[in-house]
């Protein structure tokens, strides 16, 4: 079976390897063109006034899967087409999504300023990580990526970084400045570096129980 798997991987394109979490060549022509196009479109989006209807056209060209979401901008996607954003979800200023593997954001997700979703992974040993020249002289390196999933009805506060391979369950609140390196179960309040669950979110947190806020 292992030999069969190796043969399958050999027949995969570099894009297929990348979104499957396999080691891939980031200097691949198709991937380079996709990134350059996404970066160009992000630059276009970021200079448009937030009232300009052209922003919607730019996001459509970027290939983000989903509708009825709002990105305040500036934004930066590595590809865009490997990201799915649910209904009524929102990202505040300076949203970064390095979507080398699929990024899935659920419905009604609030993301504060400077949120970063980072799927790329690099080898730990520098001997495996450093750049090298291919036979044609092009510089490349060995990279892989892990997907990120954020469930429905989450609040990801400002300056949060979510690392590759993480799933955040429905109804979670991730405190400001957290670095999320492991899965967070549904309906959790989690915070810290690395991010840890502080407690569950319960009916006691209902605004009805906090009249002092009104």
Protein language model annotation of sequence segments:
Residues 1-67, 124-127, 195-214:
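Terminal amphipathic alpha-helical/low-complexity segments used for targeting or macromolecular assembly
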Residues 15-16, 61, 140, 146-147, ...:
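Short secondary-structure boundary/capping segments
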Residues 59, 71-77:
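Arg/Lys-rich RNA-binding interfaces used to dock onto structured RNA substrates
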Residues 61, 83-85, 184:
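Short, T/G/N/S-enriched strand-turn elements that build extracellular solenoid repeat scaffolds
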Residues 67, 107, 152, 170-171, ...:
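Short acidic capping loops at alpha-helix termini that bridge into adjacent secondary structure
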Residues 75-85, 90-166, 193-194, 200-210:
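Flexible, glycine/small-residue-enriched loop-and-beta-strand segment within the central core
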Residues 162-191, 195:
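C-terminal/domain-terminus segments
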């Amino acid at each position: 079976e292992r030999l069969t798997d190796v043969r399958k991987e050999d027949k995969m394109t570099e894009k297929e390897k990348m979104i499957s979490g396999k080691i891939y060549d980031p200097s691949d022509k198709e991937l380079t063109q996709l990134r350059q196009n996404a970066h160009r479109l992000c630059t276009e989006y970021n200079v448009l006034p937030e009232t300009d209807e052209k922003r919607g056209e730019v996001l459509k060209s970027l290939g983000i899967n989903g509708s009825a979401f709002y990105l305040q901008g500036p934004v930066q996607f590595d590809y865009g087409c490997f990201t799915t954003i649910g209904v009524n979800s929102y990202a505040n200023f300076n949203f970064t999504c390095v979507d080398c593997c699929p990024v899935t954001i659920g419905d009604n997700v609030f993301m504060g300023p400077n949120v970063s979703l980072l799927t790329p992974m690099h080898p730990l040993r520098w001997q495996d990580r450093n750049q090298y020249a291919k036979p044609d002289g092009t510089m490349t390196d060995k990279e892989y990526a892990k997907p990120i999933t954020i469930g429905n009805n989450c609040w990801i506060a400002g300056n949060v970084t979510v690392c590759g391979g993480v799933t955040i369950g429905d109804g979670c609140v991730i405190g400001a400045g957290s670095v999320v390196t492991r899965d967070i179960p549904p309906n959790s309040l989690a915070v810290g570096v690395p991010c840890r669950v502080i407690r569950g979110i319960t009916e006691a947190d209902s605004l009805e129980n906090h009249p002092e806020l009104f």
